[in-house]
From Swiss-Prot:
Database matches in InterPro entries: DNA-dir_RNA_pol1_lsu_C (IPR047107), DNA-dir_RNA_pol1_lsu_N (IPR015699), DNA-dir_RpoC_beta_prime (IPR045867), RNA_pol_asu (IPR000722), RNA_pol_N (IPR006592), RNA_pol_Rpb1_1 (IPR007080), RNA_pol_Rpb1_3 (IPR007066), RNA_pol_Rpb1_3_sf (IPR042102)
Any GO MF annotation of the entry: DNA-directed RNA polymerase activity
Protein name in UniProt: DNA-directed RNA polymerase I subunit RPA190
Residues with the Phosphoserine modification: S889, S1636
Organism of provenance: Saccharomyces cerevisiae (strain ATCC 204508 / S288c) (Baker's yeast)
Length: 1664
């Protein structure tokens, strides 16, 4: 597009619809009939897919327009389909309406009055009248309610019983009432729409917002659900057959059952033959005579009377089409609203034709060109699909002809049947071929293994599809890409361009009298000599290439540049010269990934001869996240003045000094420049006159115009005798003096640097940086001053003098430090890394103490004595158990790590810097680390001291199955080194094992980085797509692209993040009062502002707040609204946020002395300046705050580790962090998050002991926690309960901890324990046994779990606490679900007595005994065991009546239990016996019992697993629960502050506390994720994201479900599932208003945010 020629028309909206068959035929240039594409000579065949009517091909001219391949636009053709085919994209909707249709009366099966109600509601929603659509339900007529079915159904049901006359009468009354109700509703709708139109709430074209869209979606879904719920037609009372589909190709009709057929016969309606659309003559009277017509006798499925009574019948698409045509004609009243999201102004009828395809569009030839690979020519894949359709069409035509011929010749029925079945198969095939062409995934019988040929849908979707690859982003001309290399000598806002690019990139510059000389020379230089030109554009737009011309020819053209061409009229454009890129041109530089706006900035060009790469200044590396190890960057050369203006004034590098993420600087000097700055500004740096002047001249370069004065100003020397010397600080002062504006006061600044005073020696004050009137008086300049750091000298200059000065200072300092370091050199040798002999001794001594650390940690975790030797068998045994359990090993890792980390920090703090051979500042290593130039204390300590503990996924090095971490260690070795503690240092080398561990840790980091990139990239894409249209309006409100209000003010106070950093630095502002006064120039603004109203009001509110803010319910009954809510801050001076006002007033109150000392500045003046500063810090209208918010969350997420592993156990609750947590909050908006938590603030008067007790009382207690050991004894022998059958028995003996211990630790009584075992544990155990047996006997399904055929019992319904168990689909599960009572034959008293006797004898037998035990120690005191066993035998023999009754009850309720006893006295043990059939395979019973112990719950508050009492943070004492149950906590107000409960479960908070609380939770949770990594993201971005997620009063995810309600179809299509959204847009006949940025990009319009948010109108001069 040539923007120099304006166009009078533009696209303002796009309507979606479906082309009818008639329209396709009208558009088509030719019908395609021939499947052959080319003839033998390779020429296109007439009627084939490359027919010349569809476009020029193979150097043949197009027969439609007569143009060649270059200019012919292409023309579409069409293929006539022999039968209507289902459109695969609309198949689901077709299927819904087919199932909802009555095949007798051809209405929807839902009663007409209900359908009318939906029609009315949908019509109201077309005009955006949501409230009125809800009120419609209130319209009733006497006893008849619109939503009641009862009247109608009652009338229908009674029809049969009443006499004919009575039935007719009641029907008449009913229909009269219903018609009256319909007309009443229609009247209401008409009035509501008319009123809304007159009030201006809607328009003739309707109103369509995201909320209306959401309501409409819900209503249509509800309508479809209602339609499909009716089995019998509400209108005629007939049963229609059900349908089923097979893929997207076939629909079958299912036969009715006898009862339904009888009902239909009684009603006596006739079903039409929808193939021929003729009424059948006879009633459905049950006779199944074959039709006389031969054709119909074999045409099964043609005649409704001859359909089979059972099974399914294939229905032809013709019949489906005819059914739906009739239904759609009769149901227009509702369908015209279902299929139009806006008022249907065209009044076209909604037809069912949309669901079918009679004609297939053939794309023009130019879009289906064959691909060439060397000599081979491959046919286009689309042609293959279209050829198949043509071939099948011809087959159907031939079969039809054959059938007609056979019918005429009266050939036998069998032969005709064969032809007919082939015809049916061909119908299915053509449907399949059409499906494959439209959507390859919907074609049946795809060849396995082969990738299917992509259809139309595949061409649109995914990253490689039309939308994302060719519309949302395109390849461009006038761009270059090369490797970048550093260049500290160019300006920070420049880019060094190599000559190879400079002679290729051109700009079309119009020739004027002002640039004629320059352009003439460019033309003479030609295309190969820089600065030259490549071509000239004449007034008529024709181009003259200079390539290949001689110098004389070029001179001749150069001399005619201002001479107009002879045949051109007077009012024309100038000639243009396509000149080479030249110095000071502006280009856009971009480094991918483009994560935030600073990844693409405008640089000025500096062409550097003899270079081959792009040259970038060091200060830009932070913004681009670039390094010079081979990174490549893209350079784009804007091609018109508009783009150049934006690149120069908005996207320029100087303006990107602050990042919008947090408002902190993103550009600054790095590495060697910082080291040089430290040395240059240190107290012992002195320079002679020659050096001083050389440095000043070298860095300022006055000939390039970098000075702000006419000549360089220098300072007098500090030392005059013996010869003049200048300090490094004076050089800095001189630089500032020459680059800051001469008409403004010098800067005043007090700040701190990174290097503490003690490093410089006693009495040093170099840690404090002091600038007074632009002179550096004290302090070292390091990273904190001119790096990318807040409140340093460069940041302060940016605030006071603006971005240009800050950028210039960075450039000049960069050159100064480069020159300085070139002269003095900076190096780092081995001496800088050495420790003194004493230092080495300290290191060795401290590391000696670490020998026992691992053993002590292991002893502590295993509860053994501190002095236990490392080879103690009990220790090793316990360690083995711990290391086999993930949670326990986590605790061991945490304890060991904390101990060894203490040693590491002890070594480092002792040896560095006290033990280093060279001391700072002579130690270059220390100088780099301390000043922030490179590295940190960690790097220094790893080189000099030790590497420390290697961590993998937050844990120590994992252990192999053998119990070793590496083969060179012993199993379960406790030495810290075996767990990955590296005592070696890089200075003296590390051992092979240590090297291996270090490599493991390094590998984890690399994998994490690779995986993280895609995760965070997708997260950012989701955010950007949802927020892309959110912008600042001219009334300071934040709105979405369609005008939906998101926030009343950006961040609540309308402040721009990049302007707020110094807003509350009042002392700095006071010090620089006069400079700021000059900057803001209040005198020029006063006449445009209201300076009284807001100030008066704010005084009133401030007074009221001071007086009443201490009152208890002050916030609930505020008298005055905040001043920002009443007065627009852009217009009224003094309209500031309450927060800012309070801070300002507090500063003025506390610092009144400062105003007395400062000359001429009083409090009133300062307050006015700060209010003006607030006004000048407002966000600009048009700012795309949505995209900035998404970038500000997306970009820092790449710095987070992907998986953060915080294991449960060490006084901390398990919590998801990092990108997984961000995805959980933002992308899935999950209602069931991985680690839900509540934070409960404890009252101050509750002691820690009470808090711990409360913790225990609400924590979940499992049976496994009170069990000391389980012993299982397995025996095989004869069963005593089942008539002597062989049985396999298991005696399970559970030994608990001491009763006092578990009641004290968990507050559990022995009665509770017994209750859990008998009511819950045994049920679960039996279920697990059945499951295990089933698993073992998969082959013999029915015979399992029969155990001993003792009692006909089953597993009873288990306790409510076991709901969480996820069983397979067993018998038990179905019993649980249906809550059925289990039936069994209860044994009588005699039988019980017999059983008891048998049990006693079996105890004494002990046949084939096999003991399993998981006891903690095997070499226990044998006597004690025997003693306990004796007491158990005695207890079993001497059961009292209560115990016997309990045992018999348990036995009677369970399948396998034959004996049960519990220690009621001391609660020390429980024993029971299980009997299974002898042929049951051996079970690992101990494992099963252990597992069930862990699943059996003694006590639990629903949804809360455990509660922990972490260490207080910031003095706040809290409890943290795993799991969320607010209601349960509300009852605990004696211990906790119920009003202060918070949770990380947004969905739970929304449900309980409402949407505002949920919004705040989202903000807090995202902020928590970032704060863990010390990343600061402004709360404004988080507020905006939270507001967008909760804007509909719900918790909407940033995924395609959350996007569904958006009004921009193009935006949804360019995101994901293009065809799904396209289908919906087409079916709803949606209108795309082109409001959203994505939609505007699709149609090539300028975006309506930023500089596109307004139009510039030129004043038309009055006609003379």
């Amino acid at each position: 597009m040539d923007i120099s020629k304006p166009v009078g028309s533009e696209i303002t909206s796009v309507d979606f619809g479906i082309l009818t068959a008639k329209e396709i035929r009208n558009l088509s240039a030719k019908q395609i009939t021939n499947p052959t594409v080319l003839d033998n000579l390779g020429h296109p065949v007439s009627g084939g897919l490359y027919d010349l009517a569809l476009g020029a091909f193979l150097r043949n001219l197009c027969s439609t327009c007569g143009l060649d391949e270059k200019f012919c636009p292409g023309h579409q053709g069409h293929i006539e389909l022999p039968v209507p085919c289902y459109n695969p994209l609309f198949f689901n909707q077709l299927y819904i309406y087919l199932r909802a249709s009555c095949l007798f009366c051809h209405h929807f099966r839902l009663k007409s009055v209900e359908v009318h109600r939906y029609a009315c509601k949908l019509r109201l929603l077309q005009y955006g009248l949501i409230d009125e659509s809800y009120k419609l339900d209130e319209i009733t007529l006497g006893s008849l309610n619109s939503s009641m079915y009862t009247d109608d159904e009652a009338i229908e049901d009674n029809e049969d019983e009443m006499d004919g006359e009575g039935s007719k009468q009641s029907k008449d009354i009913s229909s009269t009432l219903l018609n009256e109700l319909k007309s009443k509703r229609s009247e209401y709708v008409d009035m509501a729409i008319a009123k809304a139109l007159s009030d201006g709430r809607t328009t003739e074209r309707g109103s369509f917002t995201a909320t209306v869209n959401d309501e409409r979606k819900k209503l249509v879904h509800e309508f479809h659900k209602k339609l499909l719920s009716r089995g019998k037609c509400d209108n005629c009372g007939m049963f229609s057959p059900k349908f089923r589909k097979d893929g997207f190709t076939k629909i079958f009709e299912t036969a009715l059952n006898e009862k339904q057929i009888t009902n239909n016969r009684v009603k006596g309606f006739i079903r039409q033959d929808m193939i021929k659309k003729q009424k059948q003559a006879k009633k459905l009277d049950g006779s199944n005579e074959a039709s006389a017509n031969d054709e119909e006798s074999f045409d099964v499925g043609r005649n409704p009377t001859t359909r089979p009574k059972t099974g399914s019948t294939y229905i032809l698409s013709t019949e489906v089409k005819n059914i739906l045509d009739t239904v759609f004609r009769k149901e227009q009243c509702v369908l015209q609203y279902v299929f139009h999201s806006r008022p249907n102004l065209s009044r076209k009828l909604v037809k069912a034709d949309s669901f079918f395809m009679d004609v297939l569009v053939v794309p023009p030839t130019r879009f289906r060109l064959p691909s060439k690979l060397g000599e081979e020519v491959h046919e286009n894949s689309q042609n293959q699909l279209l050829s198949k359709v043509l071939t099948t069409s011809l087959l159907i035509r031939d079969l039809n002809d054959d059938l007609s011929k056979l019918q005429k010749d009266k050939v036998s029925l069998e032969d005709r049947r064969v032809i007919f079945s082939r015809l049916m198969n061909a119908f299915v095939t053509i449907q399949n071929d059409v499906n494959a062409f439209i959507d390859s995934t919907k074609a049946q019988g795809r060849t396995s293994g082969k990738v299917p040929i992509p259809g139309v849908k595949q061409a649109l979707e995914k990253k490689e599809g039309l939308f994302r690859k060719h519309m949302m982003g395109k390849r461009v001309n006038y761009a270059a890409r090369s490797v970048i290399s550093p260049d500290p000598n160019i300006e920070t806002n420049e880019i060094g361009v190599p000559p190879v690019f400079a002679v290729k990139l051109t700009y079309p510059e119009p020739v004027t009298a002002y640039n004629i000389a320059e352009l003439r020379q460019a033309v003479i230089n030609g295309p190969d000599k820089w600065p030259g030109a490549t071509q000239i554009q004449n007034e008529d737009g024709s181009l003259v290439s200079l390539i290949g011309m001689s110098v004389e020819q070029r001179k001749a053209l150069a001399n005619q540049l201002l001479t107009p061409s002879s045949n051109v009229s007077t009012h024309t454009l100038n000639k243009k010269v396509y000149r080479h890129i030249k110095n000071r041109d502006v280009v856009l530089m971009n480094r991918q990934p483009t994560l935030h706006k600073a990844s693409m900035m405008g640089h000025k060009v500096r062409v550097l001869p003899n270079e081959k790469t792009l040259r970038l200044h060091y200060a830009n590396t932070g913004a681009y996240n670039a390094d010079f190890d081979g990174d490549e960057m893209n350079m784009h050369f804007p091609q018109n003045e508009n783009a150049r203006a934006e690149a120069l004034n908005l996207a320029n590098t100087d303006s990107q000094y602050l990042t919008p993420t947090s408002g902190s600087p993103v550009r600054g000097l790095i590495q060697d420049h910082i080291s040089a700055g430290v040395w240059l500004t240190s107290k012992d740096s002195f320079f002679t006159r020659e050096q001083y002047q050389q440095y000043i001249y070298g860095c300022i370069r006055p000939e390039d115009g970098h000075t702000t004065r006419s000549k360089i100003v220098t300072l007098p020397p500090t030392i005059f005798k013996p010869y003049p010397l200048w300090t490094g600080k004076q050089i800095i002062t001189t630089v500032l003096l020459n680059v800051t504006p001469p008409d403004m006061p010098g800067i005043n600044l007090i700040s701190k640097n990174k290097i503490k005073n003690e490093y410089w020696g006693k009495g040093s004050l170099e840690n404090e940086v002091l600038f007074k009137d632009g002179a550096l008086l004290c302090g070292i300049l390091d990273k904190s001053q001119y790096g990318a750091s807040k409140y340093g000298i460069v940041h302060s200059l940016h605030e006071v003098y603006g971005p240009e000065v800050a950028a210039k200072v960075l450039s000049v300092l960069g050159r100064l430090f480069t020159n300085y370091i070139t002269a003095t050199a900076f190096t780092c040798g081995m001496d800088d890394l050495r420790l003194t002999a004493e230092g080495n001794k300290w290191r060795t001594d401290i590391l000696k103490t670490s020998v026992d650390t691992g053993r002590e940690a292991a002893a502590e975790v295993t509860n053994l004595d501190k002095d236990t030797p490392a080879d103690d068998p009990e220790l090793l045994k316990r360690l083995q158990e711990i290391l086999r359990d993930n949670n326990k090993s986590g605790i061991l890792d945490a304890v060991t790590s904390s101990k060894v980390n203490a040693i590491t920090s002890q070594v480092v703090s002792k040896c560095v810097p006290d033990g280093t051979m060279k001391k700072f500042p002579c130690n270059s290593m220390q100088a780099m680390a301390l000043s922030g130039a490179k590295g940190s204390n960690v790097n220094v300590s790893q080189i000099m001291c030790l590497l420390g503990q290697q961590a993998l996924e937050g844990r120590r090095v994992p252990v192999m199955v053998s119990g070793k971490t590496l083969p060179s260690f012993k199993p379960y070795e406790t030495d810290a080194m075996a767990g990955g503690y590296v005592k070696g240092r890089f200075y003296s080398g590390i051992k092979p094992q240590e090297y291996y561990f270090h490599c493991m840790a390094g590998r984890e980091g690399l994998i994490d980085t690779a995986v993280k990139t895609s995760r965070s990239g997708y997260l950012q894409r989701c955010l950007t797509k949802q927020l892309e249209g959110v912008h600042v309006s001219y009334d300071n409100s934040i709105r979405d692209a369609d005008g939906t209000l998101v926030q009343f003010m950006y961040g609540g106070d309308a402040i721009d993040i990049t302007k707020e950093s110094h807003m509350t630095q009042f002392e700095f502002c006071l010090d620089n009062y006069y400079a700021l006064l000059k900057k803001y120039n209040p005198s020029a603004l006063i006449e445009h502002l209201d300076v009284e109203s807001a100030l008066k009001y704010s005084k009133k509110t401030l007074k009221y707040r001071k007086k009443h803010s201490k009152e208890p319910h002050y916030k609930q009954s505020v008298k005055y609204d905040p001043v920002l809510a009443k007065y627009n801050p852009a217009k009224y001076l003094g309209s500031v946020s309450e927060n800012f006002q309070d801070k300002l007033e507090s500063f003025l109150d506390k610092n009144s002395k400062l105003f007395k000392s400062s000359d001429g500045v009083n409090e009133k003046k300062f307050r006015a300046l700060m209010q003006l500063k607030y006004m000048r810090s407002l966000i600009n209208p048009g700012e795309a705050v949505g995209i900035i918010a998404s970038q500000s969350v997306g970009e820092p997420s790449t710095q987070m580790t992907l998986n953060t592993f915080h294991f449960a156990g060490h006084g901390a609750a398990n919590v998801t962090l990092g990108i997984p947590r961000l995805r959980e909050i933002v992308m899935t908006a999950s209602a069931a998050i991985k680690t839900p938590q509540m934070t409960l603030p404890i009252w101050n008067d509750v002691s820690d002991e009470q808090a711990d007790t409360f913790c225990k009382s609400i924590s979940k207690v499992l049976l496994s926690e009170v069990i000391d050991k389980v012993i299982v004894t397995e025996t095989t022998g004869t069963s005593n309960t089942a008539g002597g059958n062989a049985a396999r028995s298991y005696v399970i003996h559970m030994r608990f901890f001491d009763n006092n211990e578990y009641s004290e630790e968990y507050d559990v009584s022995k009665e509770e324990l017994q209750n859990v075992i008998s009511n819950q544990f045994i049920h679960l155990l039996e279920a697990a046994i059945v499951k295990e047996i089933k698993k073992q006997k998969r082959t013999t399904g029915p015979d399992i779990g029969v155990a001993v055929p003792r009692l006909q019992t089953d597993v009873a319904n288990s306790s409510s606490n076991s709901k969480r168990l996820e069983e397979d689909n067993d018998e038990e599960q179905s019993h649980k679900k249906t809550k059925q009572a289990v039936s069994y034959d209860e044994p009588d008293e005699d039988e019980i007595e017999t059983m008891r006797e048998a049990e006693k004898s079996s105890d004494e037998e002990g046949i084939d005994s096999d003991k399993e035990s998981d006891s903690d120690s095997e070499d226990e005191d044998v006597d004690m065991n025997e003693q306990i066993n004796k007491s158990i035998v005695e207890a079993n023999n001497n059961m009292n009546k209560v115990q016997r009754d309990r045992q018999s009850a348990i036995i009677s309720h369970h399948r396998f239990i034959t004996k049960y006893n519990f220690d009621d006295e001391s609660g020390k043990w429980c024993e029971f016996k299980l009997e299974l059939a002898a042929d049951t395979e051996k079970l690992l019973m101990v494992n099963i019992v252990e597992e069930i112990c862990r699943k059996s719950i003694i006590r639990q508050i629903p949804h809360i697993d455990r509660c922990v009492h972490p260490e207080p943070e910031n003095g706040k004492r809290v409890l943290v629960t795993e799991g969320v149950n607010f209601q349960a906590m509300w009852d605990q107000e004696a211990f906790i502050d119920v009003d202060g409960i918070t949770s990380n479960d947004v969905a739970a908070v929304l449900k309980t506390y409402g949407v505002e609380a949920a919004r705040n939770t989202i903000v807090n949770e995202i902020n928590n994720v970032f704060s863990r990594y010390a990343i600061s993201v402004s709360f404004r971005h988080l507020d905006l994201i939270a507001d967008m997620m909760t804007r509909q009063g719900t918790y909407l995810a940033f995924n395609r479900q959350g996007m569904e309600t958006s009004t921009s179809s193009f935006m949804k299509m360019s995101y994901e599932t293009t065809c799904q959204f396209l289908t919906k847009a087409v079916l709803d006949n949606e209108r795309e208003q082109l409001d959203s940025p994505s939609a505007r990009i699709v149609v090539g319009k300028l975006n309506n945010v930023g500089t596109g948010s307004f139009d510039v109108l030129a004043k038309v001069p009055n006609a003379a």
